[in-house]
């Protein structure tokens, strides 16, 4: 499973196919999703709980997540080990290897800030990627492309919790 550290996200979600693969079971739940023009739509989901660990075992936390179909769409995971040789500040960073699935399955957001905060940042020149060590391990901010003109867009969906 690949996690996406997303400070703009306010709830934890996990792709439902991963939930099924891991045989995680939870309680049914209904979420109200804010969509365009002030409209809302109901989303049937489950609330599941599991233990998340850093790869080195130094951090461990039980988290509750809502299941959904492709929460990040088809957002591909960047294997920074393939790109780090382009920038001197990244060359000695031991980035984690992505999981076997090429997409991000679990956005971890502001509701779990203890997993997101920066223990150490390694920066280069203005516009270059920044390596960030978090309690879960190393990640990188920025584009893996040398051209800073390459545009990247990420979408965040806002969800309200509706108690059932």
Q: For the regions a protein language model found, what residue spans apply to each?
A:
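Classical protein tyrosine phosphatase
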Residues: 7-31, 125
């Amino acid at each position: 499973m690949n996690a996406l550290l997303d400070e703009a996200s306010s709830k934890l979600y996990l792709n439902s196919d991963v939930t099924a693969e891991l045989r995680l079971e939870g309680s049914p739940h209904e979420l109200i999703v804010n969509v365009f023009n002030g409209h809302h739509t109901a989303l049937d989901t489950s609330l599941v709980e599991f233990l998340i660990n850093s790869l080195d075992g130094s951090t461990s936390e039980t988290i509750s997540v809502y299941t959904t179909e492709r929460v990040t769409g088809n957002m591909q995971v960047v294997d920074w080990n393939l790109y780090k040789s382009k920038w001197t500040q990244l060359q000695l960073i031991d980035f984690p290897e992505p999981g076997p699935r090429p997409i991000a399955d679990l956005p971890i957001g502001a509701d779990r800030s203890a997993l997101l905060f920066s223990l150490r940042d390694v920066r280069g020149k203005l516009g270059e990627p920044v390596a960030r060590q978090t309690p879960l391990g190393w990640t990188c901010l920025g584009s893996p492309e040398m051209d800073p003109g390459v545009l990247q867009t990420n979408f965040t969906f806002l969800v309200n919790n509706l108690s059932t």
